[in-house]
Amino acid sequence: MSDWKEYSLGDISRNISRRFDFNAYPNVVFINTGDVLNNKFLHCEISNVKDLPGQAKKAIKKGDILYSEIRPGNGRYLFVDNDLDNYVVSTKFMVIEPNANIVLPEFLFLLLISNETTEYFKMIAESRSGTFPQITFDSVSSLSLNIPDKETQQKILDIITPLDDKIELNTQINQTLEQIAQALFKSWFVDFDPVRAKAQALSDGMSLEQAELAAMQAISGKTPEELTALSQTQPDRYAELAETAKAFPCEMVEVDGVEVDGVEVPRGWEMKALSDLGQIICGKTPSKSNKEFYGDDVPFIKIPDMHNQVFITQTTDNLSVVGANYQSKKYIPAKSICVSCIATVGLVSMTSKPSHTNQQINSIIPDDEQSCEFLYLSLKQPSMTKYLKDLASGGTATLNLNTSTFSKIEIITPSKEIIYIFQKKVVSIFEKTLSNSIENKRLTEIRDLLLPRLLNGEI
């Protein structure tokens, strides 16, 4: 490291406060500290300027580093890799502008999100008096950083960036896979396309055979001519499609109930409480004062672990076997469905292995494992997310959906036959999603192993 030089953070960057020009953009995207996590935007919603809070003041540009002043160990940071002219960010962010003559912006970002720097920021934050741990740029500007020449910086980036790119590609693939599963779920269980196609055909005076053909069209998206060709070229697939269409009812009926007055559902389908579909478990946090309860054995899921995750494969905290067994009734198996119910309400994920959660999460252990995907997608519907938040509001500042209320939430439930058919169609999507998530965990571990050695000049 003889050619590496020591700088303070203040030597190679500054905390910039560019005033956002609201006259240029009547509609903006406001980014608060809770809207980013581990270099990803969680929310990017357009807002009218008149609806913005007072802390919406800072403009950003490509190459900036956003880093939350509040609780710096929580991963609320982001590298701005595009021009985002209509984005305004909270004053609770440090907007760090690197000195490009000394350090590449991407390289400084790697330094700032390293475990060593994060621990330093946490120490500074916790040493300051206040309602919650907080840093300012001035309080951390003396942080000592070893910086190589820019050519070496680029070589390090060339090693780390492909890992990040592969992780991002897997993430995008998973998002696409989930959209495919969501589209099928919506067609079958929200819009009831196969049932409505049958009902309309019968209403038009067609035979039951013709009605089932109409349902086959709705399910497959094929024309009658294409279905005829399918029956000849792929008879097994055609027969499977016919059996699927046959499983759907022919009629829509009104369901009376507090939450669904006047709503039509397929005949024979029922409104069932979540507690009728599985065991409901509210998590619990073992005592932090007992160090034996924490280790590397059992995932301990908290709400930040759930963001944008179909399957939870990585957690910031883990329990020891001792800690997990101390509250053994809180164990949830693989393919349990976790729902965030306090503060950030409505996140839904599935476990990838036996786990525990904290008390902000209610989980469903499905009675029938083949219903996992159906239950997951039911709880992921936008209308359900809104309903969960409405139930949790209760007139208090902090959203809180208790376990009793959560257990009584009802969802439209078809016959087991249809649930099994649906599971068969989407299970490969979920298996591929899990595989990608596990690969991302492995790539992250490789990255985290390499990064400190690269940043210390050991490689």
Curated annotation (Swiss-Prot):
GO terms for biological process: DNA restriction-modification system. SUPFAM superfamilies: DNA methylase specificity domain. One of its GO terms (molecular function) is DNA binding. Pfam families: Methylase_S. It comes from the Bacteria. Keywords: DNA-binding, Repeat, Restriction system. The type I restriction/modification system is composed of three polypeptides R, M and S; the restriction enzyme has stoichiometry R(2)M(2)S(1) while the methyltransferase is M(2)S(1). Belongs to the type-I restriction system S methylase family. Type I restriction and modification enzymes are complex, multifunctional systems which require ATP, S-adenosyl methionine and Mg(2+) as cofactors and, in addition to their endonucleolytic and methylase activities, are potent DNA-dependent ATPases. Contains two DNA recognition domains, each specifying recognition of one of the two defined components of the target sequence. The specificity (S) subunit of a type I restriction enzyme; this subunit dictates DNA sequence specificity. The M and S subunits together form a methyltransferase (MTase) that methylates adenosines in the sequence 5'-RAACN(5)TAG-3'. Methylation protects against cleavage by HindI. In the presence of the R subunit the complex can also act as an endonuclease, binding to the same target sequence but cutting the DNA some distance from this site. Whether the DNA is cut or modified depends on the methylation state of the target sequence. When the target site is unmodified, the DNA is cut. PANTHER family: TYPE I RESTRICTION ENZYME HINDI SPECIFICITY SUBUNIT (PTHR30408:SF13), TYPE-1 RESTRICTION ENZYME ECOKI SPECIFICITY PROTEIN (PTHR30408). This is Type I restriction enzyme HindI specificity subunit. It comes from Haemophilus influenzae (strain ATCC 51907 / DSM 11121 / KW20 / Rd). The lineage of its organism: Bacteria, Pseudomonadati, Pseudomonadota, Gammaproteobacteria, Pasteurellales. The gene is hsdS.
